[in-house]
Design a protein with these regions (language model features):
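Active-site entrance/lid segments in N-terminal catalytic domains of soluble metabolic enzymes
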Residues: 1-200
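Residue-level detector of conserved catalytic or cofactor/ligand-binding positions
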Residues: 202-208
Length: 208
């Protein structure tokens, strides 16, 4: 029997978090379908508004509008399933995207491509459109024990908040990772499995 995935008060029937693929791949259709089947559907906010009529003139406004539209539609398709977003820290106007996702009712916000040091602040105190009093779960993407500890210590000190989960991306993940070209040329020699084991042993309530 497949074990459920528990993230605070959220329960996914299957321990599957669909990847956030940008520029029109991970939108409401895919995320809503994954969530409806018991996984966690993820919408990528990267250039999400490319189909909006004013995208070429005002991409920031178009993207924020699309973030809300796609989350609303995904949640309708999900029929109670878990819908989240992936927001890159490198995105211009990053905090605006976080607020838009939180307002639209995203259940989970995953953030990488940099250290999401302002994520808890941007996501807190946001009035959800559905009227629910519930903050989105927050997750940094990390590639090392060092980066995990840095973000947890910072969040705890500044916001008295710790990640609800941590996403680990290794050298084979194909994402925005903390590895240089030389390291990637010798992936087998990295012994990254050992780093994953050390990451899995971090007590999220007690960063070292």
């Amino acid at each position: 029997m497949i074990k459920q995935l528990q993230i605070g008060d959220l329960t996914a029937r299957f321990p599957v978090i669909q990847g956030g693929m940008g520029v029109g791949v991970s939108l409401s259709g895919l995320a809503g379908a994954v969530a409806a089947q018991g996984g966690i559907g993820i919408i990528s906010t990267a250039q999400i508004g490319y189909r909006e009529p004013d995208y070429q003139v005002n991409p920031h406004t178009a993207n924020l509008r699309a973030v809300k539209k796609e989350i609303r539609r995904a949640k309708e398709l999900a029929a109670g399933g878990i819908v989240g977003v992936n927001i890159m820290v490198a995105t211009k106007g990053y905090e605006d995207y976080v607020k838009a996702a939180a307002e639209a009712g995203a259940d989970l916000i995953i953030s990488g491509a940099g250290l999401p040091v302002t994520l808890p602040e941007a996501a807190s105190g946001v009035q959800r459109e559905d009227g629910e009093i519930r903050q989105a779960k927050l997750s940094p993407i990390v590639s090392s024990v060092k980066s995990a500890n840095v973000i947890m210590k910072y969040w705890m000190k500044k916001y008295n908040y710790l990640p609800d989960l941590v996403v680990i991306e290794g050298p084979l993940a194909g994402g925005h990772l903390g590895f240089d070209r030389k390291q990637l040329e010798d992936i087998e020699g990295m012994h990254y499995e050992e780093e994953v084991m050390r990451l899995s042993l971090i007590h999220i309530s007690e960063p070292t």
